[in-house]
Amino acid sequence: MKRSSGARLCSTAAIGVLSFSLLTACSDEGSENTSGSKASSSAASSPAPAAKALTTAELEKLLLAQGEVKGYKVASGDDTLPSSKSKVKTDKPACDPLAWATAALAPGDTDANASNAVSEDKTSAATAKPTDLADAFDIDMTYVGLSSYAGDGAEKAMKAVSDGVAACAGGYGLKADGESTKVTRTAAEKGAAKGDETVAFASDVDMEGEGTATFHTAVVRKGNTVATFYTVNFAAMAKGGEMGAVPAAVIDAQVAKLK
């Protein structure tokens, strides 16, 4: 049976990946940048020391905090985001980095990962009260993930995302906590030049037989840290259609905090 718009709104209010499956409860209605360091003249020919990965605790300190982005609220996102990569699986290994990026998980090979959620703050705006449930959910929420890598791991993570966009152009199946959904199309997008490297892509997701919705993801590398951004508009998601782009203000503020 197809769920009503109200039920789907209930679901979208608590998801952070390209799937309804994380919300079954509602279904019934720093390290230093060594690449820039200079070797002494006596060791000019020696290879630069490999970059060290930041710890999860260090990454958590680099996440955006309340008050650092005007017009936005910051929350932990712990109640909506999957706790580990084992919770998010695809039917094509090449597509795993894309699914992880949309879930604020590390797209590459590392255990150092931290995440939160940054949403529009409309409470201070002098506007009329929402007229219906959909209007109340008409906010953009961006799930932000930070991951850190040793050596050239960050570059490899970015390549995995870029390669995945091409390999998964025809879509892929996604499963979370035993529930499945379908990404029907993936396409590269022109992302703003941020950090040292940026990969952006759009994903069309089947809305349980009620059309598709298009989501946008941006992945930015700065040094050996990778930041992922995935934006959901709850009202738009309930209707099907296209989500807004990842807010530039959120990307700019987060990348500025990275070492």
Model-found features: residue ranges?
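C-terminal motif of bacterial Sec signal peptides marking the signal peptidase cleavage site
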Residues: 21-25
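Bacterial N-terminal signal peptides that target proteins for export
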Residues: 2-13
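Soluble non-cytosolic domains of exported or imported proteins
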Residues: 53, 155, 241-245
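A short, solvent-exposed beta-edge/loop patch
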Residues: 185-248
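Short, low-complexity, Pro/Ser/Thr/Gly-rich segments in the mature regions of secreted, periplasmic
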Residues: 248-258
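Bacterial signal peptide processing site
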Residues: 27-30
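Post-signal peptide N-terminal segment of mature Sec-exported envelope proteins
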Residues: 36-61
